[in-house]
Every structure is written in structure tokens, then in C-alpha cells.
């Protein structure tokens, strides 16, 4: 039951975070960010947000820095939009799955040549 609720809250957070990051964050360091996944612990205390960023490595690091500075604002926005007793503590991480998928696709394409 706790896992089902955590999954529902993660999906709701993913939707709300996408809107918050695209419309509310005015930091120029935060560029084109896509929320790819959100994992919430069973006790709803921690939320790990996976993001992908369009740009080079410096742009990714700047975006992560901008998001970490705006973490309090983002958490309060989530708290206002989703009715929870306590809003989960948010951490941002890069989603490496897209890059790994592209790398594997390139390798497979090279093998077929």
C-alpha cells in the first residue's frame, strides 16, 4: 500500500515539477530541463528527481547548481500543489539512461555496417 501511494505521489510530483521548472524558475543557469523520473521513498520523506539537460557538460553543471539553489522554492511550490503532511526533501540527479541508450544504439548501428 505504501509503495502504491509513493508511486502515485512520484507521478504527481513529476508532472508538477515539469510545470514548475518550465514556468516558475527564472534562474538563467537553468536551461532546457526535462524531468525524466521521480522516485519517492516509502515513508515519503525523500524524493530523487532524475533530469536530462540539453547542452554540454558545463551547461549541465550550471543547471544542477541553479536547481540546488532553487530547491527550497521548488519544495514549497510542490507543497502548495500537492496536499501532503510533509513535503519530501528533493535531490536532483542526472538521468544517464538516455546517454547510455544512445551509446548502445550507436554501437549496434556500427556493428551492422
From Swiss-Prot:
Any single biological process term in GO? maturation of SSU-rRNA
Q: Which domain of life is it from?
A: Bacteria
Any single GO molecular-function term of the entry would be: ribosomal small subunit binding
Per UniProt, subcellular location reads as: Cytoplasm
Q: Which InterPro entries match?
A: KH_dom-like_a/b (IPR015946), RbfA (IPR000238), RbfA_dom_sf (IPR023799), Ribosome-bd_factorA_CS (IPR020053)
Instruction: Determine if Ion transport is one of this entry's keywords.
Output: no
Keyword RNA-binding assigned to the entry: answer is no
Q: Which UniProt keywords apply?
A: Cytoplasm, Ribosome biogenesis
List cellular component terms (GO): cytosol
One Pfam entry name: RBFA
Query: Which residues are the signal sequence here?
Result: none
Q: Which family does it belong to?
A: Belongs to the RbfA family.
Complex formation? Monomer. Binds 30S ribosomal subunits, but not 50S ribosomal subunits or 70S ribosomes.
**Protein function:** One of several proteins that assist in the late maturation steps of the functional core of the 30S ribosomal subunit. Associates with free 30S ribosomal subunits (but not with 30S subunits that are part of 70S ribosomes or polysomes). Required for efficient processing of 16S rRNA. May interact with the 5'-terminal helix region of 16S rRNA.
PANTHER family noted in UniProt: RIBOSOME-BINDING FACTOR A, CHLOROPLASTIC-RELATED
Q: What is this protein called?
A: Ribosome-binding factor A
**Organism of this sequence:** Oceanobacillus iheyensis (strain DSM 14371 / CIP 107618 / JCM 11309 / KCTC 3954 / HTE831)
Amino acid at each position: 500500500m505504501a509503495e502504491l501511494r509513493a508511486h502515485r505521489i512520484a507521478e504527481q510530483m513529476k508532472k508538477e515539477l515539469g510545470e514548475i521548472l518550465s514556468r516558475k524558475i527564472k534562474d538563467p543557469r537553468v536551461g532546457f530541463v526535462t524531468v525524466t523520473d521521480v522516485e519517492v521513498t516509502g515513508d515519503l520523506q525523500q524524493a530523487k528527481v532524475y533530469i536530462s539537460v540539453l547542452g554540454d557538460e558545463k551547461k549541465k553543471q550550471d543547471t544542477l547548481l541553479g536547481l540546488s539553489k532553487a530547491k527550497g522554492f521548488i519544495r514549497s511550490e510542490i507543497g502548495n500543489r500537492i496536499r501532503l503532511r510533509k513535503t519530501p526533501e528533493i535531490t536532483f540527479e542526472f538521468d544517464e539512461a538516455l546517454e547510455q541508450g544512445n551509446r548502445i544504439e550507436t554501437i549496434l548501428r556500427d556493428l551492422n555496417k
